[in-house]
């Protein structure tokens, strides 16, 4: 009996050692050595305190900040422990009503007229996208500039500086990281004595 069990037990133990300890240890070590920031979650710090991750979207609702994509992750959205979409199809009346409500909110809050970029009123598959399109950022410039008493041209330039182009010039779409942009806004307000930063 043991003669037949021994090879299976040895193989199981070896595979547990390789796949459970050696391989993860090597990958973790290589990641910490080559890409320490990414390996630790792409965390963003402000004054020595972690304020978020460049990979996880956050809720911004006040007029002096750029707003990210809507979220369906968790009961109230933006729940990193419940990443996911709403799973509602295009014919679902609840989804249509929710999008219409978001459109109204964008129009009222930002005084927007004309077309609204889809990523500003629809949640992503993960519900935690950290980025918005440059068009969505441009749509919010006037509101943010007014709330912070900044020239619109200054805010527009800041958006351009925080726009990431396509990878290798062809992969993906240009995008703006909302958290990084909002932190840059705070830094700009802090260094401009004539600017009132609304908290």
UniProtKB/Swiss-Prot annotation:
Keyword Iron: no
The entry's keywords: ATP-binding, Cell inner membrane, Cell membrane, Ion transport, Membrane, Nucleotide-binding, Potassium, Potassium transport, Transmembrane, Transmembrane helix, Transport
Pfam families listed in its UniProt record: KdpC
Top-level taxon in the UniProt lineage: Bacteria
Biological role: Part of the high-affinity ATP-driven potassium transport (or Kdp) system, which catalyzes the hydrolysis of ATP coupled with the electrogenic transport of potassium into the cytoplasm. This subunit acts as a catalytic chaperone that increases the ATP-binding affinity of the ATP-hydrolyzing subunit KdpB by the formation of a transient KdpB/KdpC/ATP ternary complex.
Subunit structure: The system is composed of three essential subunits: KdpA, KdpB and KdpC.
HAMAP family to which the protein is assigned, alphabetical: KdpC
Name of the protein described by the UniProt record: Potassium-transporting ATPase KdpC subunit
Naturally occurring in which organism (per UniProt): Gemmatimonas aurantiaca (strain DSM 14586 / JCM 11422 / NBRC 100505 / T-27)
Gene: kdpC
């Amino acid at each position: 009996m043991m003669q037949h069990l021994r090879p299976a037990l040895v193989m199981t133990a070896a595979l547990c050692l390789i796949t459970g300890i050696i391989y993860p240890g090597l990958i973790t070590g290589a990641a910490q050595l080559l890409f320490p920031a990414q390996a630790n979650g792409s965390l963003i710090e402000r004054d020595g305190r972690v304020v978020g991750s460049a990979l996880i979207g956050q809720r911004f609702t006040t007029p002096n900040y750029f707003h990210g994509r809507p979220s369906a992750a968790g009961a109230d959205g933006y729940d990193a422990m419940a990443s996911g979409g709403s799973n509602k199809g295009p014919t679902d009346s609840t989804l249509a009503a929710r999008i219409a409500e978001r459109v109204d909110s964008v129009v009222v809050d930002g005084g927007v007229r004309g077309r609204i970029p889809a990523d500003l009123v629809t949640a992503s598959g993960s519900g935690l996208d950290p980025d918005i399109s440059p068009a969505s950022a441009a749509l919010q410039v006037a509101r943010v500039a007014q709330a912070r008493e900044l020239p619109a041209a200054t805010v527009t330039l800041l958006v351009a500086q925080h726009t990431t182009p396509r990878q290798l010039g062809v992969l993906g779409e240009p995008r703006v990281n909302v958290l990084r942009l909002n932190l840059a806004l705070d830094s700009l307000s802090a260094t401009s004595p004539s600017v009132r930063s609304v908290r």
